[in-house]
C-alpha cells in the first residue's frame, strides 16, 4: 500500500502515528486491477526468473544439508525478505524497465541463494543476471531500503552480487569474505 505517500504494509502501520488525513492508495508502478488490488504478475515473473530455490544435484544426506554457523550467518539480511514488493514499487529502475530489471526484491533473493553454501548453481545464477538490465540497472537510489518494512537493504546485496560478478569471480575468491548483510 501507499500510505500518506510512502510504501508500507497496512497491517503494521500505526494509523495513530500518521498525519491526518490518512491517504491510502495502491502501490505505485503496478497496474490496478480493482480498488487496492494490483497486478503483480511482472513482479513474480522477475522473482521466479532468479530460480528462488536451492539447486543441488548431490545425493541428499540422510537428514539435512548442514551449514556451519558462519555459513548460515551469510544469509542474514537477505532471507528475511517477505516479497511484499514495497521496494520494487518504489524503485525507479523497476518503473522504467519492469520486464528487464529483476528489481530489488528479486535481487536480494538472488543474493540469498548465491551466498548459500548448500547451493551449487552460483555460476549459473550469475550468468542469468549478466547483461545491462537484469542487475546493472540499479542506480543505488536507496528507495528500496527506505521503504522496506523488514529494514533490509537490497542495494547492498546488489552491490555484493556486482562484486562477485567482477572481481571475486575471476579470482575465484569467495563473496563470503564480506561480513553478512544485516537489517537496519
Positions of predicted regions on the chain:
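Ferredoxin-type iron-sulfur electron-transfer modules in oxidoreductases and energy-metabolism complexes
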Residues: 22-89, 93-184
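Hydrophobic/aromatic-rich structural module bridging two neighboring secondary-structure elements via a short loop
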Residues: 1-28
Amino acid at each position: 500500500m501507499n500510505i500518506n505517500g510512502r510504501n508500507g504494509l497496512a497491517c503494521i502501520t500505526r494509523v495513530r502515528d500518521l498525519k491526518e488525513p490518512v491517504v491510502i492508495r495502491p502501490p505505485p508502478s503496478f497496474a490496478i486491477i480493482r480498488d487496492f488490488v494490483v497486478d503483480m504478475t511482472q513482479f513474480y515473473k522477475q522473482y521466479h526468473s532468479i530460480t528462488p530455490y536451492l539447486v543441488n544435484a548431490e545425493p541428499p544426506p540422510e537428514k539435512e544439508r548442514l551449514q556451519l554457523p558462519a555459513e548460515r550467518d551469510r544469509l542474514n539480511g537477505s532471507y528475511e525478505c517477505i516479497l511484499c514488493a514495497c521496494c520494487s514499487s518504489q524503485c525507479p529502475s523497476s518503473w522504467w524497465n519492469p520486464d528487464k530489471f529483476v528489481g530489488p526484491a528479486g535481487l536480494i533473493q538472488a543474493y540469498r541463494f548465491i551466498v548459500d553454501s548448500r547451493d551449487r548453481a552460483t555460476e549459473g545464477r550469475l550468468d542469468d543476471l549478466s547483461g545491462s538490465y537484469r542487475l546493472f540497472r540499479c542506480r543505488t537510489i536507496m528507495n528500496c531500503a527506505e521503504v522496506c518494512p523488514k529494514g533490509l537493504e537490497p542495494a547492498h546485496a546488489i552491490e555484493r552480487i556486482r562484486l562477485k560478478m567482477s572481481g571475486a569471480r575471476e579470482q575465484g575468491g569467495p563473496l563470503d569474505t564480506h561480513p553478512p548483510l544485516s537489517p537496519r
